[in-house]
Amino acid sequence: MKIRESNYELLRIISMFFIIVWHVITHSGLEVNSIGATNFFINLLLLLSIFHVSVFMIITGYYQSKSKFKLRRLLSLLLEIGFYNFVINTFFYITGIVEYTNIDYLKSILFYNFSALWYIQCYIIVYLLSPFLNRFIANVDRVTLKKLIIVLLLCFSIFPFLSSGLTFNTNGFTVYQYVTLYFVGAYIRKYNLNSEFLNRFNKSQKQLIYLSIFIVSWLSNVMLYYFANYLTQLDSNILNYIGNSLVVYKYYYSNPLVIIQSISLFMLFGTFKFTNRFINYIASLVLGVYIIHETDVIKNNLYNWLNLSVDIESGKIIIIKIILFTIIIFVVCILIEIVRRLIFKLIYKIKTVRSIDGKLVNFIDNLMKVN
């Protein structure tokens, strides 16, 4: 069996780590409550974290554009979400760690709040669309696909940025954004841009170019933030409005600089060619990490328990704590996901379960085939 190359799998792991960094900071309110040097370093961490969701979207397009739609994969994801929602809420309800009324508990396990997992929501929709997107990608010519990507980026990234969010303002938390970056990943895969792009340069030179693009775009976003803050302090309603819009826009997934960072980082990792079974295995678990730590009851309580406060701790201590808590959350969620997989494997060994699963998948799969 061919082992998948580990360059993008390593990127998945790194990206999930920084997504957790983002959540630790934002769910704790640190970006709002911090001041001075602490605020500076927290914002640097946020700006190092914001583009990693877009990286995930590109990776999805890169691989899924050459893969077949598998209903079992979708059903497995939905089952995983339901499992964690039931187990986590039941654990906190029984132990009393989190206060529930009986009605609250029943609501939490029977009516799942998909909006809490907006990325998973978008992923499911894009996965359902993938047979149709892939048919289009396979049949369209290169120029047309490139033009489509440009139009999508203009509509959902560049125009909103230039107009301070007055046009097509989706913030990037949408299926539109996911489909756009799906096409970007598919384009890179279909036309082998990792080899073709900058082909006059050797590997080391390519890496330097991609890294330079990444650093310049990241620094540009940092400068944008401080320029926007400067505008908010001027005696002009118009400039204040633009400044306030840009302060927020730096953290939008549709920010052109964020998209450039994600693409350049993806291309940089495309220059690394190696395989590692351990990295691939851990990478296969990271979606579970996202689901666990973003489940409503975890998200609404965990960051209060962490008790991160800029009022009682110095900037250095708070940054160290952010990284430390991120590592703990990542490792604990990985271990939980390993246990969950073992449980599911044991359940699937039951003959009746396999039979029901096979019949259900075959029935629905036949309904959804794209001929």
Name the predicted role of every residue range.
Residues 1-371:
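Alpha-helical transmembrane segments and their immediate juxtamembrane cytosolic regions
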